[in-house]
Amino acid sequence: MAYTLQAILGRSEVLYGASLQGTKLVPLLSGVSMLPLGRAFLEACGAPFLPLTDAGETSLPSTIREICAQLAEGGDVAYVEAEFSGGEGIQASVLFHRGGVHDPPRLATNAINIALQALGVNPPAGSDEFSAVGLGAHRDTEQWLSSAGA
């Protein structure tokens, strides 16, 4: 079964009140919230779908980078991507700190877990950060937006 995600993650208090055209704040578990970056958002800002994992880019599009940097003025945020199908796939993450890029893009099967660790997520024994915040609840970005009423 396929899984795709393109989103901005952050502590709930950091992302609280964030408003981006075409998306809606989705509370997750462990004090984390998410701004899913679906089709409407990508079209509105002219950004590509999964630029790091699908398009093979080595840096974020400027529109997404600027939005993340602005959000990170209030605390750390992470831009994340995931693309899996049939047990094969990759994740990407970019951590933003104090209004700028903290780490270069990371492509790895656990890139989202590493970003969530940096955001302060401590999973219980036998779990990982991805599961601890509930990112497995939906299989793609548009489902997250539908569940949030966007």
Locations of the language-model features?
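Short, extreme N-terminal segment that most often corresponds to the first beta-strand
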Residues: 1-29, 149
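Charged interaction segments
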Residues: 32-150
